Curated annotation (Swiss-Prot):
Annotated Pfam families: tRNA-synt_His
Miscellaneous comment text of the record: This function is generally fulfilled by the C-terminal part of HisG, which is missing in some bacteria such as this one.
SUPFAM superfamilies with a match to the protein in the record: Class II aaRS and biotin synthetases (SSF55681)
Principal subcellular localisation of the protein: cytoplasm
GO cellular component, one term: cytoplasm
Protein name: ATP phosphoribosyltransferase regulatory subunit
Record-level Gene Ontology MF annotations: histidine-tRNA ligase activity
Similarity comment: family membership: Belongs to the class-II aminoacyl-tRNA synthetase family. HisZ subfamily.
GO biological process, one term: histidyl-tRNA aminoacylation
Keywords for the protein's UniProt record, in alphabetical order: Amino-acid biosynthesis, Cytoplasm, Histidine biosynthesis
Description of how the protein assembles with itself and partners: Heteromultimer composed of HisG and HisZ subunits.
Protein's gene: hisZ
Compartments (UniProt record): Cytoplasm
Domain of life: Bacteria
Length: 379
């Protein structure tokens, strides 16, 4: 391997983002943040690194295994590089914005770094953009966050946006009602995660028929809700189901084009969520575009939010359109170049007056150049 190749080698899961992708991501993030702002979400910007004890407090505890840690040479305290921005926004809401009126609407965008990638997302560093609605326990807050993030993807041009709704607190409510705990609960939880109805039947005892019915109820929202409503659920689980039905009703009224499915037993990735949660997908894409749901904010404050994963969002979009690049030969009056930029051109100025404009334009990736008689196409 050459010295140049060695210098370009990056750790697994990390990459350089090159033109035009870097600019494309920036423009997409700008569009998202502008859309969030128009809906009353104020932007915050937490630091990339902070003390471990605050970064991993509360909902942040769910990211502990994915957090890089370093020793702060100034304070001699452990610090963590954020693996997710939601816990940081929750901290800001509970502390620096603790006296602000509720509900509090915040937005954010930035890079996160994780210890390990996954099969569907091997990248360990990627961009996030999202919203948090803090201080409301109303089903309308859940619906607002779901609809806003799905609508934002629609506005960007993502095809066939859909949301898979989950109730990570539903199964624990059933377990509690039937006295299922310890190793039995762990085995059943693993079986439910893999939709293993046979193991549920063998291990579930009196709760087995109900748990099997929950597995079978997964599917389009209307059918899933009909099947869930036909089940004799314990009171706490029934309350979760009723809230789900209300959110589906509100979301369907606000964004009828959004395809909704329900998986009543899904839990993976929602470990710190305390209520209705969701995953966003696009047509013909296996990777999730984002996740959201209800969680407990700082001081036990009710909160809900959603995070979009920019690498997946960009992959779901048509590629960036080539910029209209115009080569302007050296010596061209500056006012002329300014006028062309005002018309939407990207101008690339020549540096060598003796250079051949046709050749230089090709070298600079310009499909047009400024000639003596105006703009001409580069052959």
């Amino acid at each position: 391997m050459t010295e140049s190749a060695n210098r370009a080698l990056l750790p697994a899961g990390l990459r350089d983002m090159l033109p035009p992708d870097a600019e494309f991501e920036a423009s997409v993030v700008h569009s998202l943040m502008s859309m969030f702002a128009r809906h009353g979400y104020d932007r915050v910007k937490p630091p990339l690194i902070e003390f471990e004890e605050s970064l991993l407090d509360g909902a942040g505890g769910g990211t502990s295994s994915q957090t890089f840690r370093v020793m702060d040479p100034m304070s001699q305290k452990m610090m963590g590089l954020r693996a997710d921005m939601t816990p940081q926004v929750a901290r800001i809401a509970a502390t620096r914005l603790g006296s602000q009126p509720r509900p509090l609407r915040l937005s954010y965008a930035g890079q996160v770094l994780r210890v390990k990638g996954t099969q569907l997302r091997p990248e360990r560093q990627f961009g996030q953009a999202g919203i948090e609605l803090i201080g409301s326990d109303d089903a309308g807050a859940d619906a607002e966050v779901l609809v806003m993030t799905a609508e934002a993807l629609d506005d960007l041009g993502v095809p066939g946006v859909s949301a898979d709704l989950a109730l990570p607190t539903l199964v624990p409510a059933v377990f509690a009602a039937y006295g299922i705990n310890g190793e039995t609960a762990d085995r059943l939880r693993a079986a439910l995660d893999h939709k293993d109805s046979a193991t549920v039947a063998a291990q579930g005892g009196a709760a087995a028929p109900l748990l099997q019915a929950l597995i079978a109820a997964a599917g389009p929202a209307a059918r899933a809700l009909a099947e869930l409503c036909a089940l004799d659920l314990p009171p706490a689980a029934a309350a979760e189901r009723d809230r789900l039905a209300r959110v589906v009703e509100l979301a369907g009224a606000d964004l009828p084009s959004l395809t909704l499915t329900v998986d009543p037993v899904e839990n993976r990735g929602f470990e710190y969520h305390t209520g209705l949660s969701f995953t966003l997908f696009a047509r013909n894409m296996g990777a999730e575009l984002g996740r959201g749901g209800r969680y407990q904010g700082g001081g036990g404050e009710p909160a809900t939010g959603a995070t979009l994963f920019m690498d997946s969002v960009l992959a779901a979009l048509p590629g960036p359109k080539p910029a209209k690049r115009l080569f302007v030969p050296a010596g061209t009056p500056r006012a002329w170049a300014q006028a062309f930029r005002a018309q939407g051109w990207v101008t690339v100025s020549g540096l060598d007056p003796a250079a051949d404009p046709q050749v230089e334009a090709k070298h600079q990736g310009c499909r047009h150049r400024l000639g003596p008689d105006g703009i001409v196409e580069v052959e």
